[in-house]
């Protein structure tokens, strides 16, 4: 995805070691019809890269820390955070979370965000959306959803010029590892 490439390029620039980016479509990105938790959860954005590490097809993998499984894959190791961004979530759209009209359709796929939205805005409808950032943004442009919830670091890293409103950590707690990019060997 464009975001994964941006994160890899940014990580490489900080590591300052001659590198080649090898892209792979992860398991969770291949099936956009099922929720990630039905496929096995967080680690589904890292499985192919981890297999490539174990087969010595790549030297390291760059991940969004929030997508990594909580238990390391045997034979691999997370070396640490290469860089970090704003961990908070944000609402993409004309209105902040509090200002969204009743009945608004809010797109997200994270169970954490879905449950928070049910508590905070029970008068709105949560629409599960999957896909890369541009695919999700197109759902606003097409009218499929009125707003999206994305990580603020996504907006910052991609340099997106879209109306957005950052959500306080007191309103929706960020995901563990949100905004952090890690290297795995």
Question: Predicted regions: what is each one?
Answer:
Residues 2-185:
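Domain-level signature for soluble enzymes in the chorismate/prephenate branch of the shikimate pathway
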